[in-house]
């Protein structure tokens, strides 16, 4: 059987692509080396932030606004919401370049963002402590996503729509010819007109020339109480320290507050190098500078986990066809800020399989930018 689209890697982007392409009437085969959702890829742990006024650059705003529409639609397929509108407060020095980008994005796209000085911040959320030179940019319409629920929902909807799914079966080789794309797996060979490579952190095992660097990252849960929960209107947050370190975190659930450090980490080359949480001496203390100064009421570390970023050289996404192979789309290099975009990236992949022109300017995400 020849498929219209084969998806290599069925985590967040691949799961979304499988659903949207199958819903559009295409014959789709989703593959994964493991059984998604799993803990081997870039994303695991149950929550991910979604921010609209985007500190990483205005080029992302149209994508994240479309993603929000798709998240809201996906949430209708479950009793438990996938998106929780907790609000997100971005904290940092008043001269922060990241916060300047957030403010610029908000102004250009007329987003609901409120600017608070240090006094106003600490009045609204007495749990937060910041220096006098800090500000907060509060996005009331943003919040967080239940990531594993999202992936399982896409997988279920795709399967119910007739999508073929081949999991626990790594792809060992990809072949291109005039008739399309052939993949080799432990279960045999499969052929399609087009392919999506969304293999996340370990994409270089299949496409070694891609400029993607895996980085081991950790996050942890700390003892909290009801003051830090959504029931008390405590928001999700990003925070920049005076030395430039970037942190992110979520409202407490079951008296546990999850926090991670966005920058830093350990460069690795293979999956077995991703040691578990606490295997690196700094793991347990990584969040202390932020917690001690900004959230001093939070208690000790309860447990943690390790994940992996698939970093591009400039930490912007890679969304492009493989050089010399216009029938194969690669979505990678999401650099630790990609999950919130998963539905729109999946939709872009489905449009690629349908032969449609993208609805967005993807020029900033082309591979050619690295050869200029």
Curated annotation (Swiss-Prot):
Taxonomy, superkingdom? Bacteria
InterPro entries from the UniProt entry:
FAD-dep_OxRdtase, FAD/NAD-bd_sf, Me_Trp_Oxase_MTOX, MTOX
Name the enzyme's class: oxidoreductase
Q: Which GO terms describe its molecular function?
A: flavin adenine dinucleotide binding; N-methyl-L-amino-acid oxidase activity; sarcosine oxidase activity
Extent of the signal sequence = none
**Catalytic reactions of this protein:** N(alpha)-methyl-L-tryptophan + O2 + H2O = L-tryptophan + formaldehyde + H2O2
User: Any keyword Metal-binding?
Assistant: no
Tagged with keyword Signal: no
Listed A to Z, the keywords are: FAD, Flavoprotein, Oxidoreductase
The record ties this protein, via Gene3D superfamilies, to: D-Amino Acid Oxidase, subunit A, domain 2, FAD/NAD(P)-binding domain
Q: Which cofactor does it need?
A: FAD
Q: Name one GO cellular component term.
A: cytosol
Q: How is the cofactor bound, in the record's words?
A: Binds 1 FAD per subunit.
Residues the record lists as binding FAD: 4-34
Q: Which residues carry this modification: S-8alpha-FAD cysteine?
A: 307
Question: What EC number(s) does the entry state?
Answer: 1.5.3.-
Q: What does this protein do?
A: Catalyzes the oxidative demethylation of N-methyl-L-tryptophan.
Quaternary structure and partners = Monomer.
Q: Which family does it belong to?
A: Belongs to the MSOX/MTOX family. MTOX subfamily.
Q: What is this protein called?
A: N-methyl-L-tryptophan oxidase
Organism of origin: Salmonella heidelberg (strain SL476)
């Amino acid at each position: 059987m020849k498929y219209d689209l084969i998806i290599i890697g069925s985590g967040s982007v691949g799961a979304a692509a499988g659903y949207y392409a199958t819903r559009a009437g295409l014959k789709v085969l989703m593959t994964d080396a493991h059984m998604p959702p799993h803990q081997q890829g870039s994303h695991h742990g149950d929550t991910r932030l979604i921010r609209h006024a985007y500190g990483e650059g205005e080029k992302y705003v149209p994508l994240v606004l479309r993603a929000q529409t798709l998240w809201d639609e996906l949430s209708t397929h479950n009793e438990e919401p996938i998106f929780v509108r907790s609000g997100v407060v971005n904290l940092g020095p008043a001269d922060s370049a990241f916060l300047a980008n957030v403010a610029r994005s908000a102004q250009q796209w007329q987003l609901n963002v409120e600017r608070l000085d240090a006094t106003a911040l600490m009045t609204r959320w007495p749990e937060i402590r910041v220096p006098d030179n800090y500000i907060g940019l509060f996005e009331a319409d943003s919040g967080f996503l239940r990531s594993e629920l999202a992936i399982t929902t896409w997988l279920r909807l795709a399967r119910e729509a007739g999508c073929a799914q081949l999991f626990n079966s790594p792809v060992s080789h990809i072949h291109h010819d005039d008739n399309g794309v052939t993949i080799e797996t432990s279960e045999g060979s499969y052929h399609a007109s087009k392919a999506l490579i969304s293999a996340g952190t370990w994409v270089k095992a299949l496409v070694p020339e891609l400029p993607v660097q895996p980085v081991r990252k950790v996050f942890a849960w700390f003892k909290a109480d009801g003051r830090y929960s959504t029931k008390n209107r405590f928001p999700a947050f990003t925070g920049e320290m005076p030395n430039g370190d970037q942190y992110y975190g979520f409202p407490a659930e079951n008296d546990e507050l999850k926090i991670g450090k966005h920058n830093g980490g350990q460069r690795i080359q293979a999956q077995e190098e991703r040691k578990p949480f606490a295997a690196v001496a700094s793991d347990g203390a990584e969040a202390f500078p932020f917690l001690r100064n900004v959230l001093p009421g939070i208690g000790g570390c309860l447990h943690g986990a390790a994940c992996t970023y698939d970093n591009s050289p400039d930490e912007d996404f890679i969304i492009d066809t493989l050089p010399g192979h216009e029938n194969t789309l690669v979505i990678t290099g999401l650099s630790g800020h990609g999950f919130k975009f998963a539905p729109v990236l999946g939709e872009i992949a489905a449009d690629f399989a349908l032969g449609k022109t993208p609805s967005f300017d993807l020029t900033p995400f082309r591979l050619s930018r690295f050869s200029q």
